[in-house]
Structure formats: C-alpha cells, structure tokens
C-alpha cells in the first residue's frame, strides 16, 4: 500500500511523471505521517511493503536508490521473523522492528521470507538533498567514489551473468531438457 505516490493513488506503486502526494491511506496512519514529515526534503514514494511467507524477491537493482544518486531509500521494519533472509551485494542484513535503516539499493539485493509470518516494512524514498545527506555519517558521505567503482563491477557482472543465463536457457530449450524448478537461494 502506498502512503505517498505519484498522483496520490494508494495502489500506484510505480514512479510516474507528476507530483508525489500523500494518499488517503496515510490518513489512517498519523504516526507514520509524522515520521515521513520528520525527514528534511521531499518524499517521493512511501509504501508499506509486505513479503508473505515463502516468497522471494530475486536479485535486482533499483538504479536511483542511493545517497550518491537521485533518491535515498530508508526502511523501518515493522514486523519480521527469524526466517527472513535479506542481502545487499551478498551482505546479510538483519534489521529488527523499529530500527531505521539505509540501504544502497543501487547495488544488487534480494530477499526471501522463510518464516511462517509476513514481513512488513515502512519503505520511504526521499529526493537526495544536502539536509538529508547531513544526517548520514561522514564515512558514508565520503564513500561515494568507492561505491561507484564497486557498483560498476556489479553492473558488469550482471551483464555477463545475463549473457550466460540466456545462452544456457537457449541451449536447454533446444535440447528440450527442462531446468530444475527451484534453486536454493541461501
């Protein structure tokens, strides 16, 4: 459910042209509205995101979600469980309910809910500005050049990986051999 979205639609999850506005759903959550309004600058997309038990979100990049780029993505876990596996660039992230976390989602990341209960996070995207940057430790602010170099390696690896996977899938289909339906994620 979107609390802030393009055009104020609580069901519109995409970044669309136009102004990001609060949705009617946010009227039901004044405490969350106070959290969102407490950050300097303009919020873009803000969502309550749920991952059901046994659901996967496979490796992907959110290209503009970095302190070095256009938007900063902040997470506040609301409900989680010990079966959740979340990685950013193969680094395990264990985020507990009520904590505020920044992740550089321009790096590859994935998650899996291996537990028996849903995982719910308040996920907030804010346009990068100097006041927001000032909230981050100096080491994170100063690491932009290093992150760009590492991010390029990740992007190059993604290109190679896709070529190998697509080539393998083509060969497998030519031989009419079916690949396995599941692969272990973690």
Predicted regions and their residues:
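Fe(II)/2-oxoglutarate
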Residues: 139-186
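Phosphate-end processing signature that detects enzymes handling 5′-triphosphorylated RNA
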Residues: 93-112, 126
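Conserved short histidine dyad/triad with adjacent acidic residue
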Residues: 48-67
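Short beta-strand His + acidic residue motifs that chelate non-heme Fe in jelly-roll/DSBH
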Residues: 60, 84-86, 103-104, 108-115
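A short beta-strand-loop-beta hairpin characteristic of the jelly-roll/cupin
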Residues: 59, 77-97
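Non-heme Fe(II)/2-oxoglutarate
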Residues: 1-39
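A short hydrophobic beta-strand segment most commonly corresponding to one strand
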Residues: 72-77, 100-102, 117-133
């Amino acid at each position: 459910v979107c609390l802030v979205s393009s055009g104020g639609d609580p069901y519109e999850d995409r970044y669309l042209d136009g102004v990001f506005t609060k949705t009617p759903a946010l009227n039901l959550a004044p405490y969350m509205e106070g959290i969102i309004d407490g950050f300097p600058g303009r919020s873009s997309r803000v969502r309550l995101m749920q991952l059901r038990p046994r659901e996967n979100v496979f490796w992907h990049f959110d290209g503009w979600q970095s302190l070095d780029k256009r938007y900063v993505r902040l997470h506040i876990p609301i409900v989680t469980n010990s079966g959740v596996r979340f990685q950013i660039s193969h680094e395990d992230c264990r985020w507990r309910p009520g904590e505020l976390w920044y992740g550089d989602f321009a790096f590859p990341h994935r998650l899996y809910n291996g537990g028996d209960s849903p995982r719910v996070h308040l996920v907030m995207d804010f346009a990068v500005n100097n006041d927001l940057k000032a909230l981050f430790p100096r080491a994170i602010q100063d690491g932009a050049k290093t992150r760009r170099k590492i991010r390029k390696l990740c992007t190059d690896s993604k290109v190679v990986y896709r070529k190998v996977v697509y080539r393998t899938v083509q060969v497998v289909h030519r031989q009419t051999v079916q690949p396995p339906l599941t692969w272990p994620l973690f």
